Design a protein with these regions (language model features):
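Hydrophobic, well-structured mid-protein blocks that either form specific transmembrane helices
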Residues: 97-102, 106-144
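Short beta-strand elements of ligand-binding domains
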Residues: 101-104, 126, 150-152, 182-185
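Glycine-rich phosphate-binding active-site loops on the catalytic face of alpha/beta enzymes
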Residues: 69-74, 117-133, 167-176, 183-185
Length: 185
């Protein structure tokens, strides 16, 4: 039941954004974007945060880390997120040298383009949510220059290597972050 509400909130948020700024205009805004996606090497130091924690944890404390993974998924549990919520990615990009990976409920090319415009270096796609659309979304993200990671519950990652996925998000039960990035060779 909660899953249906989350997807409805996602659709509302996406519809509102697209009504304010069309896909074509969002694409054209890339020509004014000062932040090209950076290549993500096999990093060891990742911090997982929510959008609210970016201001308090990272910018105010000036935390130094190789990579920041900003998880927007929780925003859909409480309603349709604000159209301005992704601006935290741009703020982080301007004020921190860390690589930025955007984790969200990605279901459209519009969202991937928006992530790039806001300053992300990579995205985490949810295999369970996308199912057969995973390949198309991964290919589009790669064409944009974004590094692609996948959240999966499958123990075998062979099929993901064929898609050009850089790594997977794994659950780690007794760690501070509860998750970690595992790079595919």
């Amino acid at each position: 039941m909660q899953e249906i509400g989350i997807l409805e909130n996602l659709q509302k948020s996406l519809s509102l954004k697209e009504s304010m700024l069309s896909y074509e205009m969002l694409g054209k805004s890339l020509s004014y974007n000062p932040y090209l996606p950076r290549v993500i090497p096999q990093i060891k130091d990742c911090v997982f945060v929510t959008p609210d924690e970016v201001l308090g944890k990272l910018l105010e404390e000036n935390t130094r880390t190789e990579c920041v993974i900003v998880n927007f998924k929780g925003l859909y549990e409480i309603g349709a997120p604000s159209v301005f919520d992704l601006e935290v990615l741009g703020l982080l990009r301007r004020h921190a040298s860390s690589l930025i990976v955007h984790q969200d409920l990605f279901i459209s090319h519009y969202q991937l383009l928006e992530s790039l415009v806001q300053g992300s270096d990579g995205v985490i796609l949810d295999e369970e949510l996308l199912k057969e659309d995973l390949k198309g979304m991964a290919e589009f993200a790669w064409r944009l220059g974004l590094s692609v990671f996948v959240e999966t519950h499958k123990p075998d990652y062979t099929h993901l290597k064929d898609l050009g996925v850089l790594g997977v998000l794994e659950k780690v039960p007794h760690s501070q972050n509860q998750k970690k990035i595992v790079f595919l060779d």
